[in-house]
Amino acid sequence: MYGAGGVAYVYFVYGMYYQFNVVSNVADVPHAILVRALEPVEGIEIMRERRHSHPDHNLTNGPGKLCIAMGIDRQLNGADLLGDRVWIEEYESVPSRQIAKGPRIGIDYAEAWIDKPWRFWIKDNSYVSRISRKGAKAQRKTQRKT
């Protein structure tokens, strides 16, 4: 996480799950973005095998599930996200009115940062991981504005 932006930061939690993050600042500044979910557009058959044929919307709707489905482990830690092992690419443009934001989840320890709206997702997307009550409220508020 202390490397230059544009690389993967992969770590192991709870003794059983990997988490995939995108390092997002200059070297020595520990900023990273946790990728909590994704909507598969290809490779879904292998994801089903890795996740033991869960319903498609449950294949990647959480950070641990995403890593299992994608075969992500510590070997990808530090990988260049413009390389050929793992990468992020533009797929479709999403209108800003379809992007919801709310507080992050699972960071009860973060005190002053716990309610910051630093979590973003596509509204009504079935692949989104769990949304907190505050996040759902923020999404409804955003929907009323559009």
Which sequence ranges carry the predicted segments?
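Short, low-complexity, charge-dense intrinsically disordered segments
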Residues: 133-144
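Conserved, well-structured core segments that form or line functional sites
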Residues: 1-131, 145
